[in-house]
Amino acid sequence: MLFKRKSFCKIFMVLFICPLVLQAQDDLLSEIDSVPKNQKVESAFKSLKIVNLESTKLAAKGDFYFIVAHRFGFVENGFDDFFGLDNANTQLKFLYGVNEWLTVHIARSGFQETYDAAVKYRLFAQGENNFPVTIVGFNSIAVNTELKEEDYPKLEFENRLSFATQILISRKFSEKLSLELAPTIFHENTLRDILDENNMVISPNPQENTQYAIGIGGRYKLTKRWSFNVDYVAHLNRASESIYKNPLSIGFDLETGGHVFQMHFTNATAMHETGYLGQTVGDWGKGEFAFGFNLVRVF
């Protein structure tokens, strides 16, 4: 199946960004006289991720997070697999705030039996010295342990590795609206060939190992505890023969005491960066999206 580029970016901008920006203009006008100048803006995002895309939020110094994330199967099969609930992919993540500007994590995912580790660090904060946005760096490394030496006799450890680097740029426009832009570069040391339904090679994988993307996302606060979240990542140099799609995720956050519960629909099965950025197969137009959730507990 050949990949067809679709205009999800335009649809996203029209359906989600434009209405929220219009609302933000009203919020800004009503709050412009009450917002202190030269003061760091807090809580652009309440959770460490918007949905799949990392947010500019960091853990506070000394805070320890335990995060359980699930992605179920696509809903397209209906009751055959109970709308995807029979096919769960799970990620367990441990995250720690080293200090106010540095957060680290390690995680294990069922998708390709992947282990990943990452660092996230604040470079600039919105409001400090009247700086207009928050800028955060994010670097991750993932190890695919699903690859077996019996299938790949020349397999070496470096073949299991993939890397991602993102610059997360966010602005809190009002108490309700926050938006983020995420220029991204990622590299997969191993790209699997394209196979047919019998696992026979159709063609060598045409994708370049080093890939580029741009992510956009936002949060709109509905009530004191509820918010609407959406993120989308456009791949910028995907091979025309690729079967993979751009990840689009839509959901809600619920804040309850010491944890945040995120519920969403997404066409991405993987939860680590190089997985959802480069290996999303779901097509929203064909019902190939899944229910998922992230449960974030702070200690």
Stretch-by-stretch model annotation:
Residues 1-42:
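Cleavable N-terminal export/targeting peptides
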Residues 5-9, 177, 223:
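Structural motif marking the loop-to-transmembrane transition
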Residues 25-154, 161-165, 171-181, 185-186, ...:
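Transmembrane beta-barrel domains of Gram-negative outer membranes and organellar outer membranes
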Residues 158-162, 170, 174, 207-211, ...:
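Hydrophobic alpha-helical segments and helix-packing faces
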Residues 181-234:
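A mid-sequence, solvent-exposed acidic-amphipathic segment
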Residues 191-195, 242, 275-277:
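Outer-membrane beta-barrel and related beta-rich outer-membrane complex signature
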Residues 210-212, 244-248:
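Charged helix-capping and loop-helix junction motifs
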